[in-house]
Amino acid sequence: MNNQNKYGVYVDSLLSKKVVLKITEIGKNIKQNLEKKIKNSIEGKCITEGFVRPNSLQVKTYSCGLVKDDHIEFIVVYKCDICNPVKGFEVECKVRNITKAGIHAEVKDQEDNVPITIFVARDHNYENKQFDTIEKDAIIGVRIIGMRFELNDPSITAIAYLLGK
């Protein structure tokens, strides 16, 4: 892959979420409690926007709370890093294992999180001579042709073509 075209897999995103705190969780540390509650529910998992990078969440603002019975509802605006690759996205990944069906690989970030697991099908690369020379733990370049994830998945699953050298 061409080094000048390399981009990270994460994008800074500004999102909002309704967060409920118990009356006992309200004090001088409201912001920390809101941040902790959001971190526990979304970091390291897939949400509708994509995979949320662990330890990237920062609360920017929050509403004055709305009292409901024994809890208080806040609307919280927060910033976090999201991974949501699109069709045609090129990325480097490490080969985890090779089967008759194809190559299973992972995209890892600097903290060893795995936002994307990739499958490179042998059928999609039957004319690529490089495919049979790839070994376990090799770093390969791929172009994503499709992906899927559901809420709370530990990573995004993608299918990809192998890029030539």
Label each region the model flagged.
Residues M1-K165:
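Single-stranded RNA-binding regions, centering on S1/OB-family and related RNA-binding modules
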